[in-house]
Amino acid sequence: MAAAAAAAAAAAAGDSDSWDADTFSMEDPVRKVAGGGTAGGDRWEGEDEDEDVKDNWDDDDDENKEEAEVKPEVKISEKKKIAEKIKEKERQQKKRQEEIKKRLEEPEESKVLTPEEQLADKLRLKKLQEESDLELAKETFGVNNTVYGIDAMNPSSRDDFTEFGKLLKDKITQYEKSLYYASFLEALVRDVCISLEIDDLKKITNSLTVLCSEKQKQEKQSKAKKKKKGVVPGGGLKATMKDDLADYGGYEGGYVQDYEDFM
């Protein structure tokens, strides 16, 4: 009996040890880390993985923000380069304008020019300055080299050629004060008429002949008017004397009245 009681006590003690072992196994789900603590501060296994994923999302957001901040810097640098190019062109253009202006104000002394040549030179320099200003405006505002005026025209109808002729006339006649204007027109008319037929040449010749006759009539009339100014017509002597005496007749007729009674 005593032996049976001892065996029962030993079995009960074994069960107690087994239960204690099961009790200590409850710490297994908690992951230990170096230093005696748990990962993430007493968190259950699996919680730290969620936190790691969240940290990665934040990293992605930070990278996107950095890329967004870099792009404006690239755009600003490109704009800065364009602005520097524009300023450089403006400086070059301004230098050219100053040189042209200096030549306009101070003509070359070593070369003696006639008034006509001086006028032609000034017109040429003025044209260069206008072209320079136009080119600067185009470069500044990014305008294409669009052609205007005579160069832009391609006449095909009668009205087109009429408008084309007006533009040519305005362009050419601005140099009519030049000493070489007449010889220039002579050569120009001859050159542009070379390819014409005889009938067309006759029409142009007749038109110029009529123009020449009209100019001759105007010249004769102008000379006749100049001659008439030096001749006093009939009765002019009496009228002239009367006007001279009127300057001295201050009293109700005066010398003028006496002169008329005498006559």
Swiss-Prot record:
Residue ranges with Basic and acidic residues bias: 67-111
Residue ranges, annotated region (Sufficient for interaction with EIF3B): 6-74
Cross-link named Glycyl lysine isopeptide (Lys-Gly) (interchain with G-Cter in SUMO2), sites: 111
Location of region: Disordered: 1-115
Compartments, as annotated in UniProt: Cytoplasm
GO biological process: formation of cytoplasmic translation initiation complex
Function of the protein: Component of the eukaryotic translation initiation factor 3 (eIF-3) complex, which is required for several steps in the initiation of protein synthesis. The eIF-3 complex associates with the 40S ribosome and facilitates the recruitment of eIF-1, eIF-1A, eIF-2:GTP:methionyl-tRNAi and eIF-5 to form the 43S pre-initiation complex (43S PIC). The eIF-3 complex stimulates mRNA recruitment to the 43S PIC and scanning of the mRNA for AUG recognition.
Phosphoserine modification, residue list: 16, 18, 25, 132
Biased composition (Acidic residues): 45-66
List of residues that carry N-acetylalanine: 2
Gene this protein is translated from: Eif3j2
Low complexity: bias regions: 1-13
HAMAP family on file: eIF3j (MF_03009)
Gene Ontology CC terms, in alphabetical order: eukaryotic 43S preinitiation complex; eukaryotic 48S preinitiation complex; eukaryotic translation initiation factor 3 complex
The entry's keywords: Acetylation, Coiled coil, Cytoplasm, Initiation factor, Isopeptide bond, Phosphoprotein, Protein biosynthesis, Ubl conjugation
GO molecular function, one term: translation initiation factor activity
The keyword Zinc-finger is annotated on this UniProt entry: no
Name this polypeptide is given: Eukaryotic translation initiation factor 3 subunit J-B
Family (UniProt): Belongs to the eIF-3 subunit J family.
Phosphotyrosine: residues bearing it: 259
Segments of this protein annotated with the region Promotes stable association with the 40S ribosome: 248-263
One protein family per Pfam: eIF3_subunit
Phosphothreonine modifications at: 114
Superkingdom per UniProt: Eukaryota
Species for this entry: Mus musculus (Mouse)
